[in-house]
């Protein structure tokens, strides 16, 4: 597969010498490769003996000469080698007519076809086989195909192309003039259009008159007509090369203009593509920034939710601590109430115990009095002692026991009332506690009085112990007086 590449297609032969062309391209011969001396020798005999490959049967006989004059050049670096370099390189061998690059540009290696003007330069080119061209050795061989050239244009097609090119040139000129001077440009276009139409009409009228004259002359003078025809043919022959030259020049100009326009279009398209790519990149960056902003907002919401959860947990912990503090206060208040109750109990001994103490102290006092009376009175008859030693009547004893039981009942009722009031006061608030303490002050005074009584009773007990020892001594003697018994009974009643 052969394909034309922009800037590397069919190249015409420049008129300058090969060495000056190489220097103008900036390609040094030393970098391209060493040229063998046999290739530069014009009198080559051995190279002409290289056999040419047989041609295919279906080859066009008109292209056989072109095939014999073309050479296949392979193992070219697709990134560095160009058709201009090959043209300048093979000009050293002979006159080069066409150079065509072939192969895929994306592949690392490519190949080319070089057509020489003379068949004698082909064996010289074959001598370059293996020569280093750049960084690779060349592979040169006879070609089996001719270079495909564009078809030659007919005069009608060339005229159409010229008209199209002229139209484009006129449009460009009008556009430029309108851009620079819109008003003056419009007036000039009008004048130019009138002058052109005037000249066209003149040319048409002159041609018509000339043809009429020729017809009249042909009728009368055939010889002069033949002479004029021959003259016209000569003029046409003389004018034809000028026309051809002008057409070729116009073609070249049109091609150069079309190329420049194509280049401008390509540059404009490239600029537009770059702008579009930049806009796309900007849009992508904006989308990325938006996504980042969304992620940041989500993270902020999550952080807020976490903070709310932490605050809720802290509130719960505070509530728990407050509940614990309340429970601790309640426990402390209960413990304080229990301690107070215990202190009260320890301070207030049971009245039964006090009454028993009093009864004991009264009995002791009786015994002491008896012992004293026995010691004072003289020892009389035994009959009197027996009468005094007799116990009192059972009726008196029953009355005393009933009084003692009533007093015990009253004391127990009072204690129960005090306990109930203390429990109610402990359940009330601190304000109630202060009131309870105020109410308990008289009770404490009573307890202090009871403690004083208990201290008095202890002193009396100590005295009773001393008296009991004396009474025990007196009982051995068996002395007692009735007057002392009466005093004892009155003390018990009290």
Curated annotation (Swiss-Prot):
GO terms for cellular component: spliceosomal complex. Residues 183-192, 263-340, 404-453, 463-474 have a biased composition (Basic and acidic residues). The keyword Nucleus applies. Gene3D superfamilies: 3.30.70.330. The modification Phosphoserine is found at residues 174, 187. One of its GO terms (molecular function) is RNA binding. Keywords: mRNA processing, mRNA splicing, Nucleus, Phosphoprotein, Spliceosome. It is found in: Nucleus. Residues 176-494 are annotated as: Disordered. Coiled coil: none annotated. Residues 69-145 form the RRM domain. GO terms for biological process: mRNA processing; RNA splicing. The modification Phosphothreonine is found at residue 348. Ubiquitous. Detected in liver, brain, lung, spleen, testis and pancreas. Residues 193-230, 238-262, 357-373 have a biased composition (Basic residues). Participates in the regulation of alternative splicing by modulating the activity of other splice facors. Inhibits the splicing activity of SFRS1, SFRS2 and SFRS6. Augments the splicing activity of SFRS3. Interacts with SREK1IP1. Homodimer. Binds SFRS1, SFRS2, SFRS3 and SFRS6. Interacts with the spliceosome. Belongs to the splicing factor SR family. This is Splicing regulatory glutamine/lysine-rich protein 1. The lineage of its organism: Eukaryota, Metazoa, Chordata, Craniata, Vertebrata.
């Amino acid at each position: 597969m052969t394909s034309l590449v922009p800037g590397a297609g069919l190249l015409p032969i420049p008129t300058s010498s090969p060495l000056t062309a190489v220097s103008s391209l900036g390609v040094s011969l030393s970098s391209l490769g060493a040229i063998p001396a046999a290739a530069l020798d014009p009198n080559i005999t051995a190279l002409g003996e290289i056999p040419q490959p047989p041609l295919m049967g279906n080859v066009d006989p008109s292209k056989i000469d072109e095939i014999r004059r073309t050479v296949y050049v392979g193992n070219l670096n697709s990134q560095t080698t160009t058709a201009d370099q090959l043209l300048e390189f093979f000009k050293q061998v002979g006159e080069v007519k066409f150079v065509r690059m072939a192969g895929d540009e994306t592949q690392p290696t490519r190949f080319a076809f070089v057509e020489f003007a003379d068949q004698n330069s082909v064996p010289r080119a074959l001598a370059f086989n293996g020569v280093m061209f750049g960084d690779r050795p060349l592979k040169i061989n006879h070609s089996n195909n001719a270079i495909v050239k564009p078809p030659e244009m007919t005069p009608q097609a060339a005229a159409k192309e010229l008209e199209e090119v002229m139209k484009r040139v006129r449009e460009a000129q009008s556009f430029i003039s309108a851009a620079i001077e819109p008003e003056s440009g419009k007036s000039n276009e009008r004048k130019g259009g009138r002058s052109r139409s005037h000249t066209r009409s003149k040319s048409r009228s002159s041609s018509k008159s000339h043809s009429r004259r020729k017809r009249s002359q042909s009728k009368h003078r055939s010889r002069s007509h033949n002479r004029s025809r021959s003259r016209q043919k000569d003029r046409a022959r003389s004018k034809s090369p000028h026309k051809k030259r002008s057409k070729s020049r116009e073609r070249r100009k049109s091609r150069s203009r079309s190329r420049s326009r194509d280049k401008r279009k390509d540059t404009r398209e490239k600029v537009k593509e770059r702008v579009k790519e930049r806009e796309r990149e900007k849009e992508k960056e904006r989308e990325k920034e938006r996504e980042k902003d969304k992620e940041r907002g989500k993270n902020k919401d999550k952080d807020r939710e976490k903070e709310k959860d932490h605050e809720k947990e802290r509130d719960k912990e505070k509530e728990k601590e407050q509940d614990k503090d309340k429970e601790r206060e309640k426990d402390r208040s209960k413990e304080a109430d229990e301690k107070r109750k215990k202190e009260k109990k320890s301070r207030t001994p049971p009245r039964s115990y006090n009454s028993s103490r009093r009864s004991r102290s009264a009995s002791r006092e009786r015994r002491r009095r008896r012992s004293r009376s026995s010691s004072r009175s003289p020892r009389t008859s035994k009959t009197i002692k027996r009468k005094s030693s007799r116990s009192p009547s059972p009726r008196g004893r029953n009355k005393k026991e009933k009084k003692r039981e009533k007093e015990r009942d009253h004391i127990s009722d009072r204690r129960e009332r005090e306990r109930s009031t203390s429990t109610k006061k402990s359940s009330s608030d601190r304000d109630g506690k202060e009131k309870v303490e105020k109410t308990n002050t008289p009770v404490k005074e009573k307890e202090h009085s009871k403690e004083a009584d208990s201290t008095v009773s202890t002193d009396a007990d100590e005295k009773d112990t001393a008296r009991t020892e004396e009474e025990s001594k007196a009982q051995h003697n068996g002395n007692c007086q009735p007057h002392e018994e009466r005093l004892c009974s009155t003390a018990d009643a009290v």
